[in-house]
Amino acid sequence: KKNHSITLMPAIDFLMASVDWTPKDLDRIVVAEGPGSYTGLRIAVATAKTLAHTLNIELVGMSSLLALVPYQQEGLFVPLMDARRNNVYAGFYENAKPVMPEAHLPFERVIELIKGASQVTFVGEVGPFIEQIQEHLPRTNYKETLPNAANLALLAWDTEADSLHDFVPNYLKRVEAEENWLKNHTESGESYIKRL
């Protein structure tokens, strides 16, 4: 059951208590900015922004895909998040630096993009794509991984802080309701989101 809005703050309190920290010990908040679950990203980003604002400390957003990549590893890493219907959110990293923009795309396109690369490792939600990896890229490595917050913290150490008030999640894709709405309102000039 997903109750992040209920369990997130108690989890943060527990983690801080387990290392004998108080909020005053923090000098920066690092948050996975997306892609990912729309609701999960909104909750995480709202919590991170609130903490950073309340404590008057820096906020740094880091890619959720980068959180799937092992820290300080050689070669091309392609983190995947299953986006349903054989689509993925994918990143392309060497030494934790992007070599191509992150994207929401069909998995077949990912295969095309990396076909000539050597020493490629797929990480993240690779399970649904193992057969295709083995068929099209038999010499490619793959490993199911979970996001690693410690890796993000290390990578964010010397990353420039984001503007607290301008920071928004990086969804990489519109929600299905917005895509459907846009199909029916292509020429009206109306905005899907109405300002109050």
Predicted regions and their residues:
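N-terminal beta-alpha supersecondary unit
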Residues: 1-33
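Acyltransferase
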Residues: 142-196
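Generic hydrophobic alpha-helical segments
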Residues: 8, 12-15, 19, 69, ...
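DPxDG-like acidic metal-binding loop motif
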Residues: 28-59
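Residues at secondary-structure transition points
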Residues: 2-10, 38-42, 46, 143-147
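Surface "functional belts" at beta-alpha junctions
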Residues: 3, 58-147, 176, 193-194
